[in-house]
Amino acid sequence: MKNKEHFDRTLKILVNAYLNNSLVQGNCHACAVGNMIAASLDIKYDQDLKWIGRPVAWSQVFVTLNYKIAQVKRPWAYTGEAREQINSTGYSWQELARMEYAFERAPRGKTKEEHMFNGLMAVVEVLSQIHEMDEKTKVAAKELFFKI
């Protein structure tokens, strides 16, 4: 496995966000990437799950819109605040774009909760490729998201 500590840290952020209900598809502040950046930069959330005191800049580089199938990518916007936010995660903007697309484009399911869970499973699939995880590690990672 490539960079286990980085993988474990990312997984912990996503599990905590999911179990604490601070993970929201379609919200750049609180999606999978938004949570990773917020945790990395110690950004707090308000009651509407918006960042306090920081603008969302990373979505100027890439974003997956609900009404479009293709992801919008603007690599020329990878500067300033957007660069700082993306770099804080330890992933490249291309890797984060893959995670974000997987999260937002996951199968809907019957409920919002099921859609969120499907999104997280899709992110774990992307992380397993980035970190070159074996099947056993991937299955164990997915099991962390089961709510009791």
Locations of the language-model features?
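Domain-length accessory/inserted modules outside core catalytic folds
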Residues: M1-A30, I37-I148
